[in-house]
Every structure is written in C-alpha cells, then in structure tokens.
Amino acid sequence: MGKVYDWFEERLEIQSIADDISSKYVPPHVNIFYCIGGITFTCFLVQVATGFAMTFYYRPTVAEAFASVQYIMTEVNFGWLIRSIHRWSASMMVLMMILHVCRVYLTGGFKKPRELTWVTGVIMAVCTVSFGVTGYSLPWDQIGYWAVKIVTGVPDAIPVVGPALVELLRGGVGVGQSTLTRFYSLHTFVLPLATAVFMLMHFLMIRKQGISGPL
C-alpha cells in the first residue's frame, strides 16, 4: 500500500492537498448550528443516490408511472426502503435548508464580502423547493396530478405572459404526458445539475472567504 500511495503522491501531491484542507482556520465562535449546511449537503447526496436507484424501475408515462411506483414499493428488493429514504431525506433537506438560511441570516453571513455566497445559496433554496414540487408529481396519483394542475396554473394570473408560461410548464393547454415528461426531466436532470453547479460555486466561495465572524 505504501508504494501505491507514493506513486499517487509523486504525481498528485495528495498530502499537500490534505494538509491544506485539514489546516483551514475555524473561528472559535463556530458551533453546532454551523453544521446545518453540511447536513443539507448530505441529504442532497442521499437524494441523488436513492433517486438514481429508482430510475431503473420508474416509468415516466401517465399510464405506467403509478404502477411503476407500486412495483418499486412491493416487488423490488428493498425498493420500499429506498423510496422511503428518498422521501424522508427530501423532507429533511427542505427543513435543514430553511434552518441553514435562518442561521446565515441571523449571524450576518450574507454581508460584504459574502453577497455572492448568499445569492448562490438562495438559488439553491429555490432549486430545493423545485425538487419538491416536481418530485411530488412523479407518482402521478390523484394528489400528484392535482398538485401539478394547481402549481402550473399559478402563472396564469401574470398579465400578458401568464398563459404562455402555463403552456410552457404543462407542455400544452392541459396537464398530461408532456407535463409529466417535463417535470421528470426537471427533477432528474436539470435541477440536480443546476444544484451541483451552484453548490460547487458556494463551496469554493466559502473556502476562499472563510466563515464569517461573530456579529
């Protein structure tokens, strides 16, 4: 093992990277509430893993979506556990995100020079809520269907562009297969990619600027 490590160390300088990560200064005022962001990140990783596992069995069609979810819950080995963990961690992610935003706001972590860190965090908060809205519809049961119908109908109240936005979200005049396809694409590709990009930016800025000082 020593020779393998030496081979990688010679080429990648792993030890210097590890020393840089482990030697980062942590202000003395930091407490357990500063870990909430990390918990949110952990929930996101759980979501990615369990969600990816379910894509092997889920079928994003109005005719088969509900049956495929039932199949995951009753026939797939540990499918019920994977889906349950996905649901529980989704709720936990939203809760931790709210607590993290409150902690940052109350401790002044959004002030100069960390405005952009705050902006990326707000964008990720919007993505998190969007995960919930799009994921709620995927079983395509009565609750999911009517939730989509109500949510996609909200922009209709916007003057001039409202009807066009509704049609864009639904993929047509009414809620149907095009709507489910769009929500599935948003939930499994667009939102995870956007969240990962802004999360990387968020972490890099925190790494560069450090943790904000006490009020």
Curated annotation (Swiss-Prot):
It comes from the Eukaryota. Coiled coil: none annotated. The keyword Cytoplasm does not apply. InterPro entries: Cyt_b/b6_N (IPR005797), Cyt_B6_PetB (IPR023530), Cytb/b6-like_sf (IPR027387), Cytochrome_b_N_euk/bac (IPR048259), Di-haem_cyt_TM (IPR016174). Pfam families: Cytochrome_B. Keywords: Chloroplast, Electron transport, Heme, Iron, Membrane, Metal-binding, Photosynthesis, Plastid, Thylakoid, Transmembrane, Transmembrane helix, Transport. Its cofactor is heme b; heme c. Heme b 2 binds at H86, H187. Binds 2 heme b groups non-covalently with two histidine residues as axial ligands. Binds one heme group covalently by a single cysteine link with no axial amino acid ligand. This heme was named heme ci. Its main location: plastid. The chain crosses the membrane at residues 32-52, 90-110, 116-136, 186-206. It is a multi-pass membrane protein. Heme c binds at C35. Heme b 1 binds at H100, H202. One of its GO terms (biological process) is photosynthesis. The keyword S-adenosyl-L-methionine does not apply. One of its GO terms (molecular function) is metal ion binding. It is found in: Plastid, Chloroplast thylakoid membrane. The 4 large subunits of the cytochrome b6-f complex are cytochrome b6, subunit IV (17 kDa polypeptide, PetD), cytochrome f and the Rieske protein, while the 4 small subunits are PetG, PetL, PetM and PetN. The complex functions as a dimer. NCBIfam families: PRK03735.1 (NF002990). HAMAP family: Cytb6_f_cytb6. Component of the cytochrome b6-f complex, which mediates electron transfer between photosystem II (PSII) and photosystem I (PSI), cyclic electron flow around PSI, and state transitions. Belongs to the cytochrome b family. PetB subfamily. Heme 1 (or BH or b566) is high-potential and absorbs at about 566 nm, and heme 2 (or BL or b562) is low-potential and absorbs at about 562 nm. This is Cytochrome b6. The gene is petB.
